[in-house]
A protein has these predicted regions:
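Accessory C-terminal helicase-associated subdomains
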Residues: 161, 165-258
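Conserved RecA-like ASCE ATPase "motif II neighborhood" in helicase/translocase motors
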Residues: 37-95, 250-253
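Hydrophobic positions on the alpha1 helix immediately C-terminal to the Walker A/P-loop
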Residues: 3, 7
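AAA+/P-loop NTPase substrate/partner-engagement loops
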Residues: 13-38, 51-60
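C-terminal accessory regions
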Residues: 100, 251-315
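A short beta-strand-to-loop transition that corresponds to the Sensor-1 phosphate-sensing loop
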Residues: 25, 71, 96-98, 103-116, ...
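Conserved coupling/interface region of RecA-like P-loop/ASCE motor cores
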Residues: 103-184, 188-192
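Short glycine-/polar-rich loops that comprise or flank the Walker A/P-loop
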Residues: 15-16, 96-98, 128-132, 263-266
Length: 315
């Protein structure tokens, strides 16, 4: 996202007709609010150049000089809610002279996510568009600690890496807490020190609907009874503000309100949607305990695919 934003700014300075495209609406809204810093005029201007991905299906060919798509792995296929086109990847390619896709295949988390590297390349070739690949070597959100990211991927059995036994501990801080209360105290301490810090969880608990009395995080859905712990998911109203509003720092974020954002510290609660099977020595997703209704569509009898998405969420 840092690279994407720098490219975006340079293109704006060069006078190009460019838009910053963010498929995740929470990520886009948080970016606009942070950059506008409570200034209405600035927010109105930013809203014109920061966009979701649903509108380009009706754009005339080559309407834009450049479209920069951050978190492009979350671009959607036909049939997605409120999207009337056939392929958001193809929409972007057709609508712009140059399209830049920032992609991480291992952050695809739903069956209708279509923005994989292979798919983008295939659609580009279909539309006679030249493809230039650039590999970004380090994770900014992990202080450049590639070893830690590789260890997480190996531990979750996403892929085998050379970091199966750990990473350089000086490069990245990682702790396992005994209770959710201990985790919460640690994150709160970091917040008091001026760090950006939040708690997130896997989608292993239901999210009470607005019509059932939960428009603004009134219901404590995330419960761990054995520890007497209960906290609300992020508010359904202005969901993205959970990440930037200190009055909502007690709320628990989910993948859909946190993906793409960076924090100094993050606490992760693992739920029953993921488990280790000692008989097969495998880490798997659990369909019954995974509560993202859209994320599990068509996956009841596809345990490997379900597990891949759930492990990507925790990654």
């Amino acid at each position: 996202s840092v690279v994407a934003m720098n490219v975006f700014v340079d293109l704006l300075k060069a006078g190009k007709n460019v838009q910053f495209v963010a498929p995740n609406s929470s990520f886009k809204s948080a970016m606009i609010d942070v950059l506008a810093w409570h200034k209405v005029e600035a927010k109105n201007r930013l809203t014109k150049i920061f966009s979701g991905a649903t509108k380009f299906y009706e754009a005339p060919p080559l309407s834009y000089d450049v479209l920069i798509v951050d978190e492009a792995h979350r671009l959607k296929a036909k049939g997605t809610y409120m999207y009337k086109g056939d392929s958001q990847v193809e929409d972007v390619i057709k609508a712009s002279r140059v399209n830049v896709f920032f992609i991480d295949d291992e952050q695809m988390i739903r069956p209708n996510d279509e923005g994989s590297m292979d798919y983008v390349e295939a659609v580009a070739k279909k539309n006679h568009s030249e493809v230039i690949k650039v590999h970004l070597n380090a994770q900014f959100r992990c202080s450049g600690a590639d070893g830690f990211v590789s260890w997480v991927e190996h531990t979750l059995q996403i892929r085998d890496t050379a970091n199966f036994d750990g990473w350089d501990k000086k490069s990245f801080e990682f702790k396992i807490m005994d209770t959710p209360q201990e985790l919460e105290r640690y994150i709160y301490k970091k917040q008091c020190n001026g760090d950006t810090a939040r708690i997130v969880a896997g989608f292993a608990w239901p999210w009470t609907a607005t019509k059932n009395g939960n428009p603004d995080a009134e219901v404590a859905d995330v419960t761990i009874p054995e520890y007497g712990y209960a906290r609300p998911w992020n508010s359904r109203h202005d969901q993205y503000t959970w990440a930037i509003d200190e009055t909502k720092s007690h709320q628990i974020g989910c993948i859909h309100t946190s993906q793409g954002l960076e924090f100094d510290y993050i606490g992760v609660i693992l739920g029953k949607d993921i488990y280790y099977d000692p008989a097969t020595h495998t880490i798997n997703g659990d369909y019954a305990n995974y509560y993202d209704k859209t994320g599990k569509v068509g996956l009841k009898n596809k345990p490997d695919e379900l597990s891949r998405y759930i492990k990507n969420i925790y990654r």
